Amino acid sequence: MKILLVDDERTEREGIRFLIEKFQFELEVAEAANGKLAMEYLQKYQDVDILLTDVKMPYMDGLQLAKYAKENRPDVIIIIFSAYSEFDYAKKACEVSAVNYLLKPIEVEEFKQVMEHVIALCRQKKQWKEQKENLLVADKKLLLYRLFNTKESVTEIVEKLKEYKINLENKYICFVSIETRN
């Protein structure tokens, strides 16, 4: 799993990296010094699982970054941290689907608990994705079986293909059913 750590203060990033290593979270850590660089990273690399971002940064703040991630990378789990204790910031973090809002200075035990929860959530999401992909493969195999081993109408077959987003427009397709006699 990979975490993208975003803060304009290098010492903050180093401190969080230290905690990730201390608790042996087995995360690959990528860093960005502001929201704009982090957005570019998210555009370039598809392997980020967790986005941990500060709020106040130059060029693009953490809330704008989280909004971008929510809209363009909905699979990424977002955690926001900040020195702002006002409820309005926590509310804005919720609006961009952040799973947690940590206050600076970050409490070590709270950070550990949040990260354990988020890592478990990442694992669960990956497991669900694999299960969904396996079900789609099994369902497609069933579809192929039905195409060649049943007497479904062409309309039923075309509808099933559309469910899989297989576009048949402007394509010449012929279904032939041949029965063999022994």
Please provide the spans of the model-predicted regions:
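Interdomain helical linkers/hinges and coiled-coil/dimerization scaffolds
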Residues: 106-182
